[in-house]
Amino acid sequence: MDAKVVAKISDLRKTSDVIIDSHALTREEYGMRAIPFSAHRLSALQLDALLVLRCDPEVLLDRIAADRGGRREMSVELAREIQLLQESLCLSYAVLCGCHFYAIDTTTKTKAEVKSTALTILSKIGMNIIK
């Protein structure tokens, strides 16, 4: 994340809440790759919370099969590992930032239920959420 992005987010936060959608972990031909944000840049974002969406690995594979979107095949174990690494990275960010961390289990939830859960969480930590 470069300084321009941090500056833009800081500017936007003056007038509204900001949600950042990040996929910090990627699957590469050789394995996994994460290019973590520096502690300085994370601190500059002044994050209030980190939310991770997760589900049972079998459900993740079913969702990928329904909408491949260029994603490669993977095993149940790899799907589980990717999610655990992503959750771990986000938890590390939360610890560095001193902010809340939530992992929302989407296994049995509809998109509307996931949205409602996320908005409820953000509301409870004091964000001005318009539903």
Which residues make up each language-model segment?
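A short, acidic, amphipathic alpha-helical segment used as a generic capping/interface helix at domain edges
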Residues: 8, 39, 86-89
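ATP-dependent small-molecule kinase phosphotransfer cores
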Residues: 1-35
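NTP-dependent small-molecule kinase module
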Residues: 88-131
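ATP-dependent NMP and nucleoside kinases share a basic, alpha-helical "lid"
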Residues: 23-67
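A short acidic, glycine-rich active-site loop
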Residues: 1, 74-84
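Short glycine/proline- and charge-enriched loop/turn segments
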Residues: 67-74
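Hydrophobic beta-strand segments of well-ordered beta-sheets in folded domains
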Residues: 18, 48-51, 100-101
